[in-house]
Amino acid sequence: MPPRPLDVLNRSLKSPVIVRLKGGREFRGTLDGYDIHMNLVLLDAEEIQNGEVVRKVGSVVIRGDTVVFVSPAPGGE
């Protein structure tokens, strides 16, 4: 049985992740929390374009219905 999305998020808590949003925006940060709607809280977040940091945003809440995918960040655990 494949892992459920919320189980994967739970294993990623306190780890660096990359989140891609509808419209192509990407954020990299430490996953601090989530809920059943896949709303995400990232700490020390940065907005990324073409692999480069565009700006540091610090703490950010991302609305779950805008999330395309969540992936472990390179160099993360």
From Swiss-Prot:
Keyword vocabulary terms for this entry: Ribonucleoprotein
CDD domains: archaeal_Sm1
Protein name per UniProt: Putative snRNP Sm-like protein
Pfam families: LSM (PF01423)
GO MF assignments: RNA binding
Any GO CC annotation of this UniProt entry: ribonucleoprotein complex
Ranges for domain Sm: 4-76
Family, similarity comment: Belongs to the snRNP Sm proteins family.
InterPro entries attached to this UniProt entry: Lsm7/SmG-like, LSM_dom_sf, Sm, Sm_dom_euk/arc, snRNP_Sm-like_arc
Species the sequence originates in: Archaeoglobus fulgidus (strain ATCC 49558 / DSM 4304 / JCM 9628 / NBRC 100126 / VC-16)
